[in-house]
Swiss-Prot record:
<keyword id="KW-0472">Membrane</keyword>
<dbReference type="GO" id="GO:0008495">
    <property type="term" value="F:protoheme IX farnesyltransferase activity"/>
</dbReference>
<dbReference type="InterPro" id="IPR006369">
    <property type="entry name" value="Protohaem_IX_farnesylTrfase"/>
</dbReference>
<keyword id="KW-0997">Cell inner membrane</keyword>
<feature type="transmembrane region" description="Helical">
    <location>
        <begin position="161"/>
        <end position="181"/>
    </location>
</feature>
<feature type="transmembrane region" description="Helical">
    <location>
        <begin position="110"/>
        <end position="130"/>
    </location>
</feature>
<dbReference type="InterPro" id="IPR044878">
    <property type="entry name" value="UbiA_sf"/>
</dbReference>
<feature type="transmembrane region" description="Helical">
    <location>
        <begin position="189"/>
        <end position="209"/>
    </location>
</feature>
<comment type="function">
    <text>Converts heme B (protoheme IX) to heme O by substitution of the vinyl group on carbon 2 of heme B porphyrin ring with a hydroxyethyl farnesyl side group.</text>
</comment>
<comment type="similarity">
    <text>Belongs to the UbiA prenyltransferase family. Protoheme IX farnesyltransferase subfamily.</text>
</comment>
<dbReference type="GO" id="GO:0005886">
    <property type="term" value="C:plasma membrane"/>
</dbReference>
<keyword id="KW-0350">Heme biosynthesis</keyword>
<protein>
    <recommendedName>
        <fullName>Protoheme IX farnesyltransferase</fullName>
        <ecNumber>2.5.1.141</ecNumber>
    </recommendedName>
</protein>
<comment type="pathway">
    <text>Porphyrin-containing compound metabolism; heme O biosynthesis; heme O from protoheme: step 1/1.</text>
</comment>
<keyword id="KW-0808">Transferase</keyword>
<keyword id="KW-1133">Transmembrane helix</keyword>
<feature type="transmembrane region" description="Helical">
    <location>
        <begin position="133"/>
        <end position="153"/>
    </location>
</feature>
């Protein structure tokens, strides 16, 4: 291999190291590492988003704590079971070979017992402190991630994240059901938004890791179809995400106007980064930027939903409507 090729490989490796959580930069205890704690905050954020879409928001502190606590425990269990199932695969990938299980820092038995314990604790917390529907949906999310995505879809199809993304889209349903005892159309709206957002978000990361996935035979879209095809697919799902996000104006019980206004820069930035990647699909720095922004985007959507349910937002909407009708009245005279 000549020096030019080596430089290109080193450049790609450097960019991947920047975007993918590095054990060199953040060293977690083995027992915490297998729980995949980096994924949990966004799952809890979308749970809060589901709650904010209901008339019952805000929830009482005990119910809120039980819902988020149960969700965090279930997510930790799902992460541990995922690590357990993919232990042999992780051994074969340079990026993951030093993780707790493949490196022998934890035994399989210990991780399995911890996952079962977290699952039982999550179930008891949600059943006793929230309701059966929230508990059932949480368990559905856990098993869809472990069985549907990890075991069935991930090793078999390039559409793995399209259908497997249902696991990450269930928390809004948990939040809505925790608040009301049922899901409701607004909860399903946020479920749909997360489902559309997930492929664009994950494929941006998969572009960075396509060589890693290809080396172990995992059929991620960029590894099979290439970056150009993937960038076009990201664009389609990105536009669908933007259109779906706008529907939040109508999904909110109140405060939709302020949500719609604050949403504009989020969608504008998302489309800008998607367009930049589409122009240069092999530019790893652009894939990195899109991946990072997509995370902030979903956190931002959930924050906007919470802000829209404040009294300030309601007053803003009322005053805006008064001004609007005053202008109409002046124009008609």
């Amino acid at each position: 291999m000549n020096s030019s090729n080596l430089e290109k490989l080193n450049c790609k490796s450097s960019i991947r190291d920047e975007v993918v959580p590095s054990r060199k930069r953040v060293t977690l205890p083995p027992w915490l590492e297998v729980a995949k704690p980096r994924l949990i905050p966004l799952l809890l954020a979308t749970t809060l988003g589901g709650m904010a879409l209901t008339e019952e928001w805000p929830l009482s502190s005990p119910k809120l704590i039980c819902t988020l606590g149960g969700g965090a425990l279930a997510a930790a269990a799902a992460g541990a079971l995922n690590c357990l199932w993919e232990m042999e695969l992780d051994k074969r990938m340079t990026r993951t070979s030093k993780r707790a299980l493949p490196a022998g820092k934890l035994s399989s038995e210990t991780v399995f017992l911890a996952a079962v314990s977290c699952t039982l604790a999550a179930s008891m917390l949600l059943v006793s402190g929230v309701n059966y529907l929230a508990a059932g949906l949480t368990l559905l999310g856990l098993f869809s991630y472990v069985i549907l995505y990890t075991v069935i879809l991930k090793p078999r199809t390039t559409k793995n994240i399209v259908f497997g993304g249902v696991a990450g889209a269930i928390p809004p349903l948990v939040g809505a059901s925790a608040a009301t005892g049922h899901v409701g159309l607004s909860g399903w709206w946020l479920f749909g938004l997360v489902m559309l957002w997930t492929p664009a978000h994950f494929w941006a990361l998969a572009i960075l890791l396509k060589d890693d996935y290809a080396s172990v035979g995992i059929p991620m879209l960029p590894s099979v179809k290439g970056s150009v095809f993937t960038a076009k697919a990201i664009s389609r799902y990105g536009w669908a995400t933007v259109l779906m996000s706008i529907m939040g104006v109508f999904a909110l019980p109140e405060g939709g106007l302020l949500y719609g206004i604050m949403l504009l820069p989020f969608n504008g930035r998302l489309l800008q980064l998607i367009n930049e990647l589409k122009k240069s699909p092999d530019d790893l720095s652009r894939a990195k930027s899109l991946f990072r922004w997509s995370i902030l985007y979903m956190f931002g959507i959930c924050l906007l939903l919470l802000i829209s349910r404040t009294q300030l937002s309601v007053e803003f909407e009322q005053q805006s409507m008064q001004i609007f009708f005053s202008i109409l009245s002046l124009l008609s005279n």
